[in-house]
Amino acid sequence: MSRFAEVDDQYDPDAVEDRVFDYWDEVDAYERTVEHRADGEDFFFVDGPPYTSGSAHMGTTWNKTLKDAYIRYHRMRGYNVTDRPGYDMHGLPIETKVEERLGFDNKKDIEEFGEQNFIDECKSFAEEQLEGLQEDFKSFGVWMDWDDPYKTVDPEYMEAAWWGFSKAHDRDLVEQGQRSISQCPRCETAIANNEVEYDHVEDPSIYVKFPLAEREGHLVIWTTTPWTVPANTFVAVDEEMTYQAIEVDTGDGTETLYVGEPCVEDVVDHGGYEDYEVVGEHEGSDLVGWRYEHPLREEVPEAPAFEGALEVYGADYVEADRTGLVHSAPGHGEVDFERGQELGLSVFCPVGPDGVYEDAAGDYAGQFVKDADAAIMDDLEAKGLLLSRGTVNHDYGHCWRCDTPIIQMVTDQWFITVTDIKDELLANMEESEWFPQEARDNRFRSFIEESPDWNVSRQRYWGIPIPIWTPDDWSGDVEEAIVVSTREELAERVDQDIDPESVDLHKDTVDDLTITADGTTYTRVPDVFDVWLDSSVASWGTLGYPGNEDDFEELWPADLIMEAHDQTRGWFWSQLGMGSAALGEAPYETVLMHGWALAEDGRKMSKSIGNIVAPQEAIDRHGADPMRLFLLTQNPQGDDMRFSWDEMENRQRDLNILWNVFRFPLPYMRLDDFDPDAVALDEAALETVDEWVLSRLSTVTAEMTDHWENFRQDKALDELLAFIVEDVSRFYIQVVRERMWEEETSESKLAAYATLHHVLVETTKLLAPYAPFVAEEIYGTLTGDGGHETVHMADWPDPDERFRDPQLETDVDIVAAVEEAGSNARQQAERKLRWPVTRVVVAADDDRAAEAVDRHRDLLRDRLNAREIELVEPGSDWEELSYTARADMSVLGPTFGDEAGEVMNAINAVSVTDTAVEALEAAVETELGRDIELTDEMVSFNTETPEGVEGTAFTVDGDDRGVVYVDTALTEDIESEGYAREVIRRVQEMRKDLDLDIEAEIRVDLDIADERVATLVDEHEGLIADEVRAAEFADLNAGHERVWDVESTDITITIDPVSER
């Protein structure tokens, strides 16, 4: 890029981004930046892989933008950052999309289509979606190693999962067995508890009577799942609860019901009984061992009747609500299963993986379980066993991918027994540092403590096959199985000839591979891994381990990972679980956990609600850099982000302000052939304001670095934007612009150039991780061939201690506050800043404020356009102020009686120069001609300024520091300069109309309707000529003419460029 080249008048994000994309391609900016840091200290970042099941949404965009910003920051800090992007390409997220595309309803459709065909479709879909996602990420300005992403479908990555699983097996942490799991009947596979999504639904709510076998009466249970009653195996009670036998009138007689004492009224109410009598009372422990009849024995002949079944047992999950007795079906419920295992009970589950009753369900065989609810309730009612039938609205689990209601059932699954290493998991968790830390110490710790064994098997097709081979007559003992850890081992063991370098490890390949050992043939188990196991090995899978040992030894574990807070139950957990099971260590050292991207109203973005904002829409409206700035101003530590179009527009406005600051000095620097390399800042003729802005830059740099290191890039960005907008644009540029307008090159002008150039270059470096496009364009324009090929190769700035001056910064804070108060006073007096004022009086409340004003009178004089700055020392009153008093008649009346009105009038009539009541008393006595005695309670004082003076208080950081008085009285000299400056502003605007170069000279013709105003303007003809580059004032017959209303006077101005004569 050419140094100080002409730039667009306005910041145009689209144009900037298009140019920068082209430039990056032209100079291989990413590749050169990576190469530039190749010898730096290694920083191992691991990208949490998004599913390749659709385009990027705002949450993905926030996540990827955060990652990109932190990668860029660490590169600028000198690190050699590993930035390999990852993609999760297996599992139900892909399968359900492909099923939808193919019009499939269930697994039977897949089987008819052909397993291999379906796997091929899944692979094509995943690759196709990857391309779209990758283009989305590139459009956000994200720099990662797009040419070499890790894909969970690649053989070397799948091998990493096999290897990790085999290591867990080596530690005796792998077992196969029955568990109660969440099953999606449509997908016909187990899903993890943390994958279950809850919706509010209406379900049956029934109270059922179980007939006692050895005594009169019924146990009463309550359930919302009538379809589990066929599998009822025992009833659970709280052994410490009191249970009552109540006798109720059924209309045809009486019957005895056994319910928990706290639940009697509820049961009686639901049963519609008019009255009841307590006929017995028992502790829960007394009920243990009671036997009962299965309520659906006739309908389900194979219902549990085995040893120990249909008895009452104590359990710790029983609560004192509904009936106080719990229907327990170990073939379904998780706690039921666990208690059943403790009791040594067999498992009865007459339901298939598709949620359809099997033959063992008797009359209900062939029905989908939820569809059978009505028939089961009808049968119970017909037998007189349905005490109450109603509905309940509650949260019920659904499949995370297809939204089908789940069913709880017991199946054979493969597990990594993380419960055996809970202490190790918790210890490894402590080795990682989290931002925010409380997420680790609360939410994550609780999840680990409560997590069951990890069900790693899925009964699906598109996933990493579980690398276990078993014999046909396998007993279920894992020691009798063969676990394969690598492709090399697979090639060595299988009966078929395969190339370990090229073999595809997917199901359609490995299912055909057999292993023969000691005369026994082994075949692979049919399941694939839980997709969370795929991504759980990312920390070594992205390094190509176990194939690539060098990188693993050098880099592992990860220095940093970052994802949203839902990953405490997802990727954060699965990585810790697999890292601990396989290697005994946490696979990451630092975790940054951000929130979710929500709609403007705080609700989740949803197609059904219609409140989704696509990232491309945001880019189209405002540009990638403003979108990134908005996303990066959000707290990344656990808080959810509410999308806001207004805030995104504000960020575009911030960048436009920066653009204007950047654009302002370029023509002057070009005109003067300014060479920043020839001016050393520490030797330049710096003025106070230069020293101040350099000190502010150093302070902001230090504060930003501290925020970045604490993973609060949002706070760092707040500091930077405030510096750009408030310090540089609204203060520094306003002060130094006249130095840059000077006709001759001076030491002062060069110092201003050098200062602003340095500030802008350093600012682009600080901005680069946030807004890489506009930072690139500004940096290139300011540095040309003298800088790096890209700003992203530059070092992150260090605070320059040479220029740190906290006192000066505080001084200018006070000066800026005085200036703001002075501007407010001008507005009250309706006096524009272009018009000078005779004086500004600053009454400081404290010595520090007074010192700052005194030290910087010249700066204040310039900023306030005042001929003189007067300072009133703290503790003193400005002598030109006077005070009037207002009487309080509620106090005067009782004191002065009939004279109160006369006293009040006298108080209101006088003015004093002191707010002491004694001074007022003396003035009133003079007014009345007699002595009186006043007290503080009788009056309140008002401050009166001299005519033409307005006063406004000034504050710093919310603290009152004094009052600024602006004397706006007009003199002929002030009017003359004021009108002249009004003319200058209009002529400058007309120069812009003609798009004149700053050095172009013009001729000017002024026709002023008011003769007095014309005379006043003539007095400052030289000032006007200097400011607008007027070669002469003359009568012009042609040129650019406009009529202006200036302070109610018509002024016709004509200008004509000298070069066009």
From Swiss-Prot:
It catalyses: tRNA(Ile) + L-isoleucine + ATP = L-isoleucyl-tRNA(Ile) + AMP + diphosphate. GO terms for molecular function: aminoacyl-tRNA deacylase activity; ATP binding; isoleucine-tRNA ligase activity; tRNA binding; zinc ion binding. GO terms for cellular component: cytoplasm. GO terms for biological process: isoleucyl-tRNA aminoacylation. ATP binds at residue 607. Its EC number is 6.1.1.5. It is an enzyme of class 6 (ligase). Signal peptide: none annotated. It is found in: Cytoplasm. Keywords: Aminoacyl-tRNA synthetase, ATP-binding, Cytoplasm, Ligase, Metal-binding, Nucleotide-binding, Protein biosynthesis, Zinc. HAMAP family: Ile_tRNA_synth_type2 (MF_02003). Belongs to the class-I aminoacyl-tRNA synthetase family. IleS type 2 subfamily. IleRS has two distinct active sites: one for aminoacylation and one for editing. The misactivated valine is translocated from the active site to the editing site, which sterically excludes the correctly activated isoleucine. The single editing site contains two valyl binding pockets, one specific for each substrate (Val-AMP or Val-tRNA(Ile)). Catalyzes the attachment of isoleucine to tRNA(Ile). As IleRS can inadvertently accommodate and process structurally similar amino acids such as valine, to avoid such errors it has two additional distinct tRNA(Ile)-dependent editing activities. One activity is designated as 'pretransfer' editing and involves the hydrolysis of activated Val-AMP. The other activity is designated 'posttransfer' editing and involves deacylation of mischarged Val-tRNA(Ile). This is Isoleucine--tRNA ligase. The lineage of its organism: Archaea, Methanobacteriati, Methanobacteriota, Stenosarchaea group, Halobacteria. The gene is ileS.
